[in-house]
C-alpha cells in the first residue's frame, strides 16, 4: 500500500436501508477506507445494531438488456415463420393440416422449454452478478467504531448499505493509484496539444517595453529640436551676410544704444548681431563655437542609437524564457500542473493551512477572478473548502513556488454557471504559495 499517495479526505454517510455508490461518477478517483463509525442516534425505536454490507457487481457478464433484445429478435423471427407456415397449411388438404399442427405444437413445446431454460439461467446470472459481503456490525452499546482497510478503484461497481437502526459513517482518503495513472495516459497526450502553457512575452517583459519606447521618443525629440535650432541659426547668418553694412560714423548715440540692446537680445535667441562689424566678429566666433557644440551631439548620435541595436540582444534571453518548456504533470481527474518556479522549505500536503496569490483565467484568456494584493486567500488543503482542482493543484508546492494549474470542468465548477463564469468552463490558475501552517 506504500504506492497509494493520499490526496484528500473521503467521507460517506449511510442511512439504514439506503444503498449508496462508493465512488461518485463525477469524481472517478480511487478511495481507501480506514474507519467505520456508528451514529448513536437511532432512526427508529428498535435500537438494533447496524451491519455494514458491501455489494459488489461483477463486470464479467453480458448486460441483461442486450440479452433480452436478442431473445426478442429471435422470438419475432420464429413468429413470422409460424405465420407463413400456417398460411401454406390452409391450402393443403385437411389430413396434412392435422400432421402439420402436431409438428407445430411439438415445436412450440420445445421453444417454451428453451425459453424457460434461458429465463432460469438469466435469473441465476443476476444473482451471481451481485456479491454481498458483511464488513462489520456496530452498536452504540457495544462497539462505536471499527478500523478497516478497503481500497476501491473507479472500475469497480461497489455499493454500501446499512441494515439496522443506526446510521454509519465511513472515513478514508482519495488516493493516487498506479491504475489511475495508466488511465490518464491518453489525456496526457491531448493536454500537451490543447493547452499552451508557455507565458506570453507581455507577461515576462511587463512594462519594460514601454519604458524603452519612452526613452527613444525623448531622444528623437531632442535631436529634432537641435536640428531646428541649427537651421534657424544658419538661415539668420545668410540673411545677415546679404544685408549691406551701415557706416558706424553716421550712427547717432541713440542708434548705438539701440544696437547694443538688440545685440544683447539677439544673443539670447542665438541669431547673431544685426549691427556693427565688431559685434559681428565676436558673434561669428561664438557662432562657430556654438556650431561646434551643436555638431558634437550629431557625432554622438550613433552612440545613442546603440541601445536600439542592442535591445533585441537583451530581449533574446526573455524570448528564450518564453519558449522554455516547464515541467508538467497530469494529476487525477485531468488536472494539469506546470511548475514555473520551485519554492523552498516544506511542501504543502493534506491538512495544512495554505495562503496563496492567484489569477484565474478562462480558456479564452479572460480573467474572471484574482487575488494579487491585500490579504492572501487562505484555505485548508484537502478539506473540501475549495474546488477539487485547487486541492490537487496546490499539493506539493513550497513557499515562494509558482505554478500554473489547468482545471477541467469536472474538477472545477462543473455545470454550475456563475457571474462571469459560464457552465462547463475550463479554468487556468497562476498560483504563488506565500504561507504554510
UniProtKB/Swiss-Prot annotation:
Q: What is its main location?
A: nucleus
Which cysteines link up through disulfide bonds?
none
The Acidic residues compositionally biased stretches are: 73-90, 106-131, 179-220
- State its Enzyme Commission number(s): 5.2.1.8
Q: Where is each PPIase FKBP-type domain found?
A: 351-437
Which key words tag this protein in UniProt? Answer: Isomerase, Nucleus, Rotamase
The domain of life is: Eukaryota
The annotated region (Disordered) lies at 73-132, 169-349
Activation/inhibition comment: Inhibited by both FK506 and rapamycin.
Q: List the record's Gene Ontology CC terms alphabetically.
A: chromatin; nucleolus
What GO MF terms are annotated?
peptidyl-prolyl cis-trans isomerase activity
> Mind telling me which Pfam families this protein's record contains?
FKBP_C (PF00254), NPL (PF17800)
UniProt family annotation: Belongs to the FKBP-type PPIase family. FKBP3/4 subfamily.
Briefly, what is this protein's role? PPIases accelerate the folding of proteins. It catalyzes the cis-trans isomerization of proline imidic peptide bonds in oligopeptides.
Q: What is the name of this protein?
A: FK506-binding protein 3
Q: Which gene carries the instructions for this protein?
A: FPR3
Amino acid at each position: 500500500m506504500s504506492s497509494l499517495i493520499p490526496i484528500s479526505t473521503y467521507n460517506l454517510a449511510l442511512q439504514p436501508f439506503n444503498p449508496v455508490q462508493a465512488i461518485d461518477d463525477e469524481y472517478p478517483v480511487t478511495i481507501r477506507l480506514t474507519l467505520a463509525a456508528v451514529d448513536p442516534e437511532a432512526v427508529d425505536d428498535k435500537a438494533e445494531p447496524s451491519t455494514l454490507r458491501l455489494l459488489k457487481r461483477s463486470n464479467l457478464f453480458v448486460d441483461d438488456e442486450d440479452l433480452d433484445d436478442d431473445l426478442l429478435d429471435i422470438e419475432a423471427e420464429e413468429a413470422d415463420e409460424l405465420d407463413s407456415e400456417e398460411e401454406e397449411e390452409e391450402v393443403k388438404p385437411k389430413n396434412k393440416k392435422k400432421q402439420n399442427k402436431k409438428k407445430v405444437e411439438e415445436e412450440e413445446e420445445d421453444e417454451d422449454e428453451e425459453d424457460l431454460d434461458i429465463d432460469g439461467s438469466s435469473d441465476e446470472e443476476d444473482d451471481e452478478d451481485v456479491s454481498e459481503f458483511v464488513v462489520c456490525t456496530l452498536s452504540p452499546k457495544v462497539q462505536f467504531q471499527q478500523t478497516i482497510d478497503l481500497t476501491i478503484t473507479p472500475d469497480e461497481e461497489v455499493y454500501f448499505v446499512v441494515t439496522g437502526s443506526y446510521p454509519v459513517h465511513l472515513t478514508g482518503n482519495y488516493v493516487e493509484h498506479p491504475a489511475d495513472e495508466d488511465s490518464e495516459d491518453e489525456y496526457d497526450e491531448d493536454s500537451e496539444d490543447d493547452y499552451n502553457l508557455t507565458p506570453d512575452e507581455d507577461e515576462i517583459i511587463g512594462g519594460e517595453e514601454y519604458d524603452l519606447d519612452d526613452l527613444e521618443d525623448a531622444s528623437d525629440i531632442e535631436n529634432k529640436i537641435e536640428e531646428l535650432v541649427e537651421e534657424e541659426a544658419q538661415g539668420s547668418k545668410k540673411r545677415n551676410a546679404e544685408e549691406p553694412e551701415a557706416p558706424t560714423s553716421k550712427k547717432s548715440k541713440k542708434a548705438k544704444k539701440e544696437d547694443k540692446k538688440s545685440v544683447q537680445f539677439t544673443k539670447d535667441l542665438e541669431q547673431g548681431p544685426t549691427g556693427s562689424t565688431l559685434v559681428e566678429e565676436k558673434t561669428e566666433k561664438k557662432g562657430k563655437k556654438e556650431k561646434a557644440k551643436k555638431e558634437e551631439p550629431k557625432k554622438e548620435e550613433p552612440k545613442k542609437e546603440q541601445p536600439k541595436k542592442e535591445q533585441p540582444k537583451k530581449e533574446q534571453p526573455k524570448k528564450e524564457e518564453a519558449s522554455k518548456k516547464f515541467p508538467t504533470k497530469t494529476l487525477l481527474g485531468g488536472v494539469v500542473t506546470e511548475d514555473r518556479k520551485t519554492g523552498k522549505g516544506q511542501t504543502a500536503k493534506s491538512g495544512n493551512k495554505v495562503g496563496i496569490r492567484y489569477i484565474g483565467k478562462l480558456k479564452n484568456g479572460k480573467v474572471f477572478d484574482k487575488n494579487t494584493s491585500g490579504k492572501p486567500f487562505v484555505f485548508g488543503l484537502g478539506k473540501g473548502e475549495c474546488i477539487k482542482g485547487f486541492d490537487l493543484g496546490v499539493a506539493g508546492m513550497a513557499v515562494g513556488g509558482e505554478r500554473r494549474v489547468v482545471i477541467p470542468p469536472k474538477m472545477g465548477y462543473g455545470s454550475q454557471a456563475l457571474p462571469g463564469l459560464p457552465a462547463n468552463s475550463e479554468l487556468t490558475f497562476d498560483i504563488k504559495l506565500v504561507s504554510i501552517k
